[in-house]
Amino acid sequence: MEYIKSKDIFLLMRDTLKLIHQRPMAHGSRVAYMVYLMLREGGRYEEFELADMVMVATMHDIGAYMTEAGKINDILRYEAKDSMAHSIYGYLFFKHLSPVKDLAKAIMYHHMDYDKLQKVDYAYKDLA
């Protein structure tokens, strides 16, 4: 019997969430691609760390699935007006249900102004 890998769980979750609504995961995939390119270029992370960060970046808006029914399609609303609500829901999800819970704070900070992140650990800052 083969062990289930974190990557397999991530892909299962991503694909299941896409069935509920595609927008957050499609947006997350684009963000993850940009995060990967920027962090790889920076040269501060090993490939396995980049893989974890790409997983978190892909699902950074997972909290949007907890917003009001029907509002998920209004990306401007949950990215701007309700940004803290979906950021906190996403943080709680990753903190409690994730093999990469050490990166959960990046989800909570992903809408915070860069200048306010000065006291935050650089890995969270890079991801946020």
Predicted regions and their residues:
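Histidine- and acidic-residue-rich, metal-dependent catalytic cores
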Residues: E2-A128
